[in-house]
Each structure stands twice: as C-alpha cells, then as structure tokens.
C-alpha cells in the first residue's frame, strides 16, 4: 500500500526543527507496517530531514499564493505515481483541490481546533468535508467535539 502524506507547507520535517505534526507523522510512520511505502511531502529549507521525505520546492511568485503553488507542485510530483491513500494533516482547505486532481482515498487529520482552520470553519464546510473525505481522524476528543458543534 503506497501512502502519500502531505504536511502543512510551513511544517518542518527535520530532525532538529520538526513541528508537532512532523513529530506525530514521523513517530507513527515508524510503527506502520507500510513504513517502506510511505512518502512524506512538505516544504522545508532545513537539510537535516527525516526519512521518506520529498521536498516541494517553492519560489517567490506575486501572482500565485504560496498555498496554491504548494498544492500545484504537489500535484505535479504525484501525477505519475500510484498512491492508495493521500493523508492530509491540519489543512482541510487542501481537500477540495486534491479531490479535483486525484481519485485516491483521502484521509484528513485534525491536530488543532477545526473551527479555526480555513476549510472547516462553517457547518457547510464541515458537511462538505464529511462528503468528500474518505476518513477524518482527530488527535483528541476535544478537536472531534469542536468539529461536531452546530
């Protein structure tokens, strides 16, 4: 089973400067029976990166937002590769774009308050996520309860 994990674009996946999401991803990947077929995608300038990492290059572009550039470059990287699962961490607003470019199953992880994240603030946003995401995983009961608030 081939799994692509997309980190938030500001998340460092490095030994010395890893953020909370990177630490979680790295620790859970070490325990996975699929660890040899997991690729982690992100954007970092740090050179001391962790295993199975593919850097998404970003260039300053006043005509394209960093998020759009990040997602477009990710799409190019996975275009000709076969992944069974796309795992997205803490970025619900990435999901609609990823649905347009890939039929691969999508799993969304929430590490923080969903009501403060673009793409899951409104009830309509959250209903859409429930309909277009194959699975949503919450790192705590608190974040799950926040997602389910009316």
Locate predicted features.
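Extreme N-terminal starter segment of soluble prokaryotic enzymes
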Residues: 1-3
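Short His-centered aromatic/hydrophobic patch
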Residues: 88-94, 110
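Hydrophobic faces of well-ordered beta-strands that scaffold small-molecule active sites
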Residues: 106-108
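Short, well-ordered alpha-helix to beta-strand connector turns
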Residues: 35, 83, 103, 132-134
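Alpha-helix capping/helix-boundary segments
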Residues: 46, 92-94, 142-144
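N-terminal strand-loop element at the rim of the active site
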Residues: 7-16, 23-66
């Amino acid at each position: 089973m081939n799994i692509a994990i997309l980190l938030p674009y500001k998340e460092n996946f490095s030994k010395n400067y890893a953020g909370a999401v990177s630490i979680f991803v790295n620790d859970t990947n070490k325990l996975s029976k699929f660890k040899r077929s997991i690729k982690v995608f992100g954007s970092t300038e740090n050179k001391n990166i962790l295993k199975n990492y593919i850097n998404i290059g970003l260039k300053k572009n006043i005509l394209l937002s960093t998020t759009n550039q990040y997602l477009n470059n990710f799409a190019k990287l996975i275009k000709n590769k076969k992944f069974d699962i796309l795992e997205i961490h803490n970025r619900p607003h990435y999901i609609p774009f990823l649905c347009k470019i890939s039929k691969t199953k999508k799993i969304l992880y929430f590490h923080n308050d969903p009501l403060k994240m673009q793409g899951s603030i409104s009830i309509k946003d959250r209903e859409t996520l429930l309909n277009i995401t194959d699975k949503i995983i919450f790192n705590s009961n608190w974040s799950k309860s926040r997602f389910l608030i009316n």
